[in-house]
Amino acid sequence: MGEKEEVKLLGVWYSPYAIRPKIALRLKSVDYDYVEENLFGSKSELLLKSNPVHKKVPVLLHNNKPIVESLNIVEYIDETWNSSAPSILPSHPYDRALARFWSDFVDNKWFPALRMAAITKSEDAKAKAMEEVEEGLLQLEDAFVSISKGKPFFGGEAIGFMDICFGSFVVLLKAREKFKAEKLLDESKTPSLCKWADRFLSDETVKNVAPEIEKVAEFLQELEVRAQSAASRS
């Protein structure tokens, strides 16, 4: 693409959303500078300037032009460095539509239920949210079997758009298993998805950018302690 370009990624180390562009950039062999934002402190001027609407990570800066929202960033990376490595999005329009549909399902239906189960104080609300989480995993199991057609990933032989989207939450699920003794990916219910998750975490691209499961589990415990402390003061 001619002269050397400036690529910078603003993120938070544990964020599933920040993992997504990291994977995409590595798949495309793009060199970039990473800037870690302070989760509990003041947001940087660069972040506030780059994403004034939502004021959150991740943000990709490409030659000082900001691109926001994690999956939007992944698509941008795929289209901008389209001569580097295979396409992240499927080549066929129908397959692209499926990948976007299931990615939207993960972000706007499945993960909100998981988040609700984690933060609600109501046992009834937690039970209802966990039902939605488990039902969603069954639906994703069926989607994987249908879309992968016996291949290792949603994207076929290699990690693709939907793998990046849902895979970004696998570390969080594994961390919850350690922190809460809560096994959501169950071999007896979602066998194909469980094998896919192991393959995803074992992929060299993912291993190089994903946070350590133990470290995330410790961080989740720290967050719970903070929440309990705040609740006791209110």
Swiss-Prot record:
It is found in: Cytoplasm, Cytosol. Its main location: cytoplasm. Its EC number is 2.5.1.18. Induction: By the fungal pathogen Verticillium dahliae. Glutathione binds at residues 15-16, 42-43, 56-57, 69-70. It is an enzyme of class 2 (transferase). GO terms for biological process: glutathione metabolic process; toxin catabolic process. It catalyses: RX + glutathione = an S-substituted glutathione + a halide anion + H(+). GO terms for cellular component: cytoplasm; cytosol; nucleus. SUPFAM superfamilies: GST C-terminal domain-like, Thioredoxin-like. May be involved in the conjugation of reduced glutathione to a wide number of exogenous and endogenous hydrophobic electrophiles and have a detoxification role against certain herbicides. This is Glutathione S-transferase U16. It comes from Arabidopsis thaliana (Mouse-ear cress). The gene is GSTU16.
